[in-house]
Amino acid sequence: MTVVPASSTSDFYCHQAIPGLVPIKVVVETEDVLAFEHTNPSHPVHVVVVPKKHTSSLIDLGAGGEELLAKVMAVVGEVAAQVKEEHGAASVTTNVGLYQESQHLHFHVCHRGESDEQILAMYGHHDG
């Protein structure tokens, strides 16, 4: 894997996950994007999708960022489709500012563990 150095702040993805310094279960990997099971999941299904090149956040993509974001979103879509197929629903989120614990663009693709009935009761529809 090719890694572009991160800024001086702590970046779990650049410093540990992408170079393979911590064990991760890879879900999808391309030349530019890595998707893996979260190392400290907050949901029963919790996958993180990151660009391998350091990118601070969704609002700070840098030069060439739009092309890289398109590649990341293609993997996010692939993972979300897998989660939806296996579990009936998927949630996709990203954070910026103080909500962003690691200063590296990343998306969470999750299934929170609700049953189909709980999802329908919460959202009042079925798009299946």
Predicted regions and their residues:
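HIT superfamily nucleotide-processing domains
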Residues: 1-128
